[in-house]
Amino acid sequence: MINWLLFDKDGTLLKFDETWSEISLVIINKFIEQYQVEEEQSLQEELGYVDGKFLASGILASGTLSDIVKKFQKNANHENNKEVEDWTIQLSKDLIAEYNPETVVIDDMQNTLKHFKDKGYQIAIITSDDQDGTKRFIKDAGVSHLIDDTITATINGYQKPDPKMVEDFYAKWNVVPEEIAIIGDTPTDIQMGRNSHFGVVVGVLSGTGEKSDLEEADYIYKDINEFYEKETEWNGR
């Protein structure tokens, strides 16, 4: 029986394109200017931006800032990797402050999470974002009273799809993998569910992933609202 719902954030609870796409492209352009990188298209493709689209499996859609830093260090042709890292981290902070991206959530997201809570489910967010970004989302989205925990890429050094990312979570809440459903929009989310042997692995089409990207999921739904509507299909409570 499923008791815990682990929701990915960007693309699952949050509309990725409307929130992060502009900043993602500005970061690339600023890096190219700063380090005089000539292969713009090649860099974009390495980061998962191809033919004007964010790839579901790409770093920009499902990776961390640390992943971006590593790609920048590779492409900067600069001896001082620490300088590239510091510059990228500071740029990310500056752009978030400058653009102040609006938190655009999936339609009816708050009500759907509340319906799950009313039915007795516990809810966590599992994300490649850091703690600060995740807390900001929870506050801006007005769902702090609905979220029981957050599992982020910075809490223990592991990130999706590494199952070690959730080991502390199991101990904290005395929960086993079979009681957990993970819901996400990228192949990384699906692989996280498989690697961790979660009870149910769900793909949603509200983010960057297409149906073909999520074929390893147990179920694929339009969004979290359809996931709620089809509860009897994935959980025999």
Feature names for model-found ranges:
Residues 1-5, 18, 33, 110-117, ...:
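Asp-based, Mg2+/Mn2+-dependent phosphohydrolase catalytic module
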Residues 60, 64, 104, 126, ...:
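Residues that cap or flank secondary-structure elements
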Residues 2-107, 119:
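N-terminal helical cap/lid subdomain that shapes the substrate entry/recognition surface
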Residues 12, 127-129:
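Conserved phosphate-coupling serine/threonine residues in phosphotransfer and NTP-handling enzymes
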